[in-house]
């Protein structure tokens, strides 16, 4: 069973990280091509392209300038511990055991606009380049054109290594679009998280993102090996609703009190 998640815009390159046997990102040749494109853009260009403040644009221009193809523990950190958005709050990597992290290295992948696909212990340098960015490049008008079939093939290789042909899609639509689902040989499960607010169950973005991380954590800590086990997910008050679910979309509901 393989789970895929999105990266995060919020990064942490300051706090201490446990000593794990790190791995190298696989697609740095591709990353280098994107960096070269980004280095030609001014902070003003980046601000407009990414819809970010001048301050953030300046920071990311500096990051692109400093990025190097050589990744080591002086200029990089493992991806699982570098991302700090809502999904990663739910995943809470810092509290995972060493065995959990080693399991995750085989069963979890992070999609990335710059790196394509990352294993949890792959080293990465700080960057901001969302998959939906309309960055013109030698291969087309955006990052979907740039990555083409590369990410899909890498995901398939990771699925093949599992031996059960199951992919759990916990990524956002923006990032999952980089995976060409019709080219995958896999049973694909998409968990959906609904919260009851004002008497109606619906997707509430903040809660749904955190729940995706919680599902990753559950899959890792319980060493899940088959689809039926996913239905037992019960963290943070969620429960599986069989009546609302299909063979490929697993619906989890929760009642929240505000």
From Swiss-Prot:
Gene Ontology CC annotations of this record: cytosol
Name this polypeptide is given: UPF0246 protein CGSHiGG_08495
A Gene Ontology BP annotation from the UniProt entry: response to hydroperoxide
Family label: Belongs to the UPF0246 family.
UniProt organism field: Haemophilus influenzae (strain PittGG)
Disulfide bonds: none
Pfam families named in the record: H2O2_YaaD
Source domain of life: Bacteria
